[in-house]
Amino acid sequence: MEDLLGLLLSETGLLAIIYLGLSLAYLLVFPALLYWYLQKRWYVASSVERLVMYFLVFLFFPGLLVLSPVLNLRPRRQAA
């Protein structure tokens, strides 16, 4: 047990934990927040805000591809 804890607290283990956390944030957390933001603001955004949206989609594109098979962002049907 001490060996495992010592390995995780060493510089290499700490660096691996930081890389894992950052990669999970880049591939899952930020794209999920971006999907939510785009869904809420897409039809009411100003032109500058839309430019920022396009940049964020470009920046987090790999994560958006990872999440795309499980999300459905089609517009809702209009009430008839």
UniProtKB/Swiss-Prot annotation:
InterPro entries: NADH-quinone_OxRdatse_su_L
UniProt superkingdom: Bacteria
Membrane topology designation: Multi-pass membrane protein
Chief place where the protein resides: membrane
Catalytic activity annotation: a plastoquinone + NADH + (n+1) H(+)(in) = a plastoquinol + NAD(+) + n H(+)(out); a plastoquinone + NADPH + (n+1) H(+)(in) = a plastoquinol + NADP(+) + n H(+)(out)
GO CC term (a single one): plasma membrane-derived thylakoid membrane
Entry's EC annotation: 7.1.1.-
Coiled coil residues, start to end: none
Localization annotation: Cellular thylakoid membrane
Ranges that cross the membrane: 14-34, 51-71
GO molecular function terms listed in the Swiss-Prot or TrEMBL record: oxidoreductase activity, acting on NAD(P)H, quinone or similar compound as acceptor; quinone binding
UniProt keyword annotations, A-Z: Membrane, NAD, NADP, Plastoquinone, Quinone, Thylakoid, Translocase, Transmembrane, Transmembrane helix, Transport
Disulfide bonds: none
Protein family membership: Belongs to the complex I NdhL subunit family.
Its job: NDH-1 shuttles electrons from an unknown electron donor, via FMN and iron-sulfur (Fe-S) centers, to quinones in the respiratory and/or the photosynthetic chain. The immediate electron acceptor for the enzyme in this species is believed to be plastoquinone. Couples the redox reaction to proton translocation, and thus conserves the redox energy in a proton gradient. Cyanobacterial NDH-1 also plays a role in inorganic carbon-concentration.
Quaternary structure annotation from Swiss-Prot or TrEMBL: NDH-1 can be composed of about 15 different subunits; different subcomplexes with different compositions have been identified which probably have different functions.
Protein name: NAD(P)H-quinone oxidoreductase subunit L
Organism, scientific name: Synechocystis sp. (strain ATCC 27184 / PCC 6803 / Kazusa)
Organism classification: Bacteria, Bacillati, Cyanobacteriota, Cyanophyceae, Synechococcales
